[in-house]
Amino acid sequence: MINLVVTKRTDKNLLSLMKKHYRQPKGFVGRYICSAIYYNFDYYGHIIGGSCTLNLPNRNQFFNINKNNYKNIINNIFYHIEKVNGKYPIRNFTTKVLKAWRDKISIDWKKKYGDKVIGFESLIEPPRTADLYKKDKWSYIGRTKGYTCKRVSGREKGVFPYGKRVWNYKNLRPKLVFVKHVEIKATKD
């Protein structure tokens, strides 16, 4: 059985995966919830939901939202899963984990931040093909320009009081944009 367990960002398993991940993130900015992925008692990886991206092509039109609704969109900012003993425990495991995560983080996000989740977004860097998102019926809505941003020490004017953002407009890394509405579960009357 898939079991997602909320962890801190400093979880030793997560820190180890961050070093192996293709992006090698140093941390996460904004709001986020980290979840360890278990099947029965075996650890398979981590999945993290965080604040949505500020500027994302076609996202606002897809969800029919504006900036006031950004707190209701969760970005799948990190997903790293590895086989145990050379295999996954069940068929389509990565997609089933993604679905379980969507269901669980919608509840966890509301409890932690007080915001009802209306949808999800994820940015996939080629050559990755987003197959697991396609199997989970996410919609492809476009491609980013590929700008990257990192935080360094210092101060910045505006809404970001901690650290200074440094943008890279030259070494572009465009990403595929996938989104999905929250699925409304039918209730019995």
Predicted regions mapped to residue ranges:
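Residues that cap or initiate secondary-structure elements
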Residues: 10, 82, 128, 184-186
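Conserved beta strand-loop-helix elements of the APE1-like EEP
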Residues: 175-186
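Short amphipathic alpha-helix that is part of the acyltransferase structural core
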Residues: 1-31, 36, 43
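Active-site beta-strand termini and strand-to-loop segments that position acidic
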Residues: 37-40, 180-182
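Acyl-donor binding region in acyl/amide transferases
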Residues: 33, 48-177
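Short secondary-structure junctions and interdomain/linker hinges
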Residues: 24-28, 127-129, 185
